[in-house]
Amino acid sequence: NQRQSGILASVSMAQFILESGYGKSELAQDANNCFGMKASLSGNTWSGFAWDGHSVYSMKTGEQNTDGSYVSITADFRKYSSIEDSINDHSAYLLGAMNGSQKRYEGLAGCTDYKKAVQIIKDGGYATSLDYVQNLCRIIEQWNLTQYDAAVATTPTTALYRVRKNWPDAASQKGAFR
């Protein structure tokens, strides 16, 4: 939820689509893991994580090396009790994962440019694919996912009230309370 996490809805949806094959991948179907979240990530603890800490799903996966070559490995992925837990854990990870003393995805929360947001995710080490940024941007553009991004509030969320120290009678208080 963009309003809760500050992560663009278009970016989260594009990752969901890419990482889970529109929710139809083996990992999404058998483990409710729609974002390719491995069991071992950044120390495994961050505020709001939604994984139970021990349920895993092992499967072969492809990793791309920096030279562009591919290698097949067997990896343990997080297994969730629901897709909702997968979505919540993904957001919590992007907001709270650390790389030493720095946030791994610093600047992602509140970023309003999807191209910059997906670059932050790639630069933080989320995926090994050299084409990850281009693939996410293509999905966002192909499906016009930016239409789901919440508009940034342009009006203050607090209201100011003029308060009198002394009220002569109840009638003079009319309109002072909501």
Regions found by a protein language model. Name each.
Residues 1-156:
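Catalytic cores of secreted/periplasmic lytic hydrolases that degrade extracellular macromolecules
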Residues 157-178:
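Beta-loop motif signature
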